[in-house]
Amino acid sequence: MAGWPAAEAAGALVVAILAAAAGGAAGKTTIEPCAGADTCAALLGYTLYADMKVSEVAALFGADPRAVLAANALDFASPGAANRILPAGLPLRVPTRCACSDGVRKSVAVRYSARPADTLASVADVVFAGLASADQIRTANGLSAEDPDAPLDAGATLVVPLPCACFNSTDNNLPAVYLSYVVRVGDTVQSIAATHATTVTDISNVNAMGSPIVAPGDILAIPLPACASMFPNSASDYGLLVANGTYALTAGNCVQCSCGPGDLKLYCTPASLTASCSSMQCPNSNLMLGNVTAQSTSGGCNVSSCSYAGLVNGTIATSLSSGLQPTCPGPHQFPPLRATPIAVNQGSYLAPSPAPGAGEAGGDIPGFPGSSNVSPANGPSGSVSQAASVNRPHQIVALILSVALYFQM
């Protein structure tokens, strides 16, 4: 890894060959060996296989809908955010906790409920967009070596292991959060590096690549510059990391933290997304979380600020700091929030510089492209249906004509 001696970096990585598609294509995945029970913040690069609500994407990964929006610098505060529809083909970053399981880093919290016509291959390649392979899902669930295209038992709950990386949450000795990225047709290491504001050398070092060549289905660990927190170990959000140019929600959606664009210093303010939040006033002051006061003097500028110090024992902790600086700071610049996309922009994940509840797995998931995007009323939730849709006018007309011809026979 960049920032480590080259020999140690190469020894710390294991490149595994995994089945990337039912047709037998092979994809390379960077695997980080580990030991212990620690976890880290990580991101999954997911490409929508159909038009989906934000809540449906979140339910698929057991995430909070607003957290998904925040991680992509999409407006997360407006009413009805979870019900917004995202277009098929849209690449998203999904926040996850990267654990240590069976000696390697992976996200093991995702559970998927199979629907009629689901197969291991379709779940791996379509529903989870290549983040997992059919063999990995089979092994994680102790299934027999059956045909990956054989139908699964409807309603069966599957553990879906997903790739992730921690690498001490650093890159070149600077804070970083790692994105698991599935290489798509037409991608090159150069284009991937440009899209994610990193370098070919950095991607090559992190993934122990002998040459900067990738193939569709490969999964790369992409280091993203991030703002690190300095919360005490007792904080429930200890280790919070926010990728540059994005946001994260914490403290039960009471606090929003952002990173960039001017620097890589974490900046947290009240989120105002819930009515039941503990006090956010700094002790022994009139300042609230995120407030900064500045007073110019002959010797410089006296600056006082109230900062977030983590969620400790269910209470929002704050920290007051004061000091003399050479000049007074200007207004804080926040990362720009984008409107919900209605079409796919192939350029990048982010600009430069009653749906399922939050974190509730098992919500309705749209069908495959070309099939119904309406979940069957009586079908198992949280999986894919290939039932035909009759919600488009030309299909309704065809159905009416078929019925009319039937009764004329």
UniProtKB/Swiss-Prot annotation:
CDD domains in UniProt: LysM
Entries under SMART domains matching the protein: LysM
Known partners and oligomeric status: Interacts with LYP4. Interacts with CERK1. Interacts with CEBIP.
Main subcellular location of this protein, as a coarse class: membrane
Domain LysM: 110-160, 179-222
Residue ranges listed under propeptide: 388-409
Induction details: Induced by bacterial peptidoglycan, cell wall muropeptides, chitin, N-acetylchitohexaose, lipopolysaccharide, and flg22 flagellin. Induced by infection with the bacterial pathogen Xanthomonas oryzae pv. oryzae.
Region named Disordered: 353-387
More about this protein: Plants silencing LYP6 exhibit significant compromised defense responses and enhanced susceptibility toward the bacterial pathogen Xanthomonas oryzae and the fungal pathogen Magnaporthe oryzae.
Tissue distribution: Expressed in roots and leaves.
GPI-anchor amidated alanine-type lipidated residues: 387
Annotated source species: Oryza sativa subsp. japonica (Rice)
Localisation per UniProt entry: Cell membrane
Comp. bias (Polar residues): 370-387
Disulfide bridge positions per record: 34-100, 40-166, 98-164, 100-166, 227-259, 254-282
PROSITE patterns: LYSM
Record-given protein name: LysM domain-containing GPI-anchored protein LYP6
GO cellular component: plasma membrane; side of membrane
SUPFAM superfamilies recorded: Carbamate kinase-like, LysM domain
